[in-house]
């Protein structure tokens, strides 16, 4: 099945395909490392479990979210169809936006939601350069 994705309108015309691919893989690797680490932390670190309780989420949600993150990481790193990668990027966008909203809703400061915001920047760069490839 052929992809219907189009090159982003803001794409710089003078960036080489090799540079685009290199930047994509560097940013995507950093993003996937962050998502893998948070998936691990959600499953194994008690202080992260306490944070989920503080945010009002049930204990089972950590397991579900970690599994979804790991599946998304695999889809971004593997040679998967474009539609599946789009779904992975959409899932990560929802996850990161929800993390920001949840932390702000309970009054947490930037020390709590800053990582989600920084990871969101990595997400945006990864998605942008994926679309350029």
Task: For every predicted segment, state its role.
Residues 2-133:
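Membrane-interface extramembranous regions
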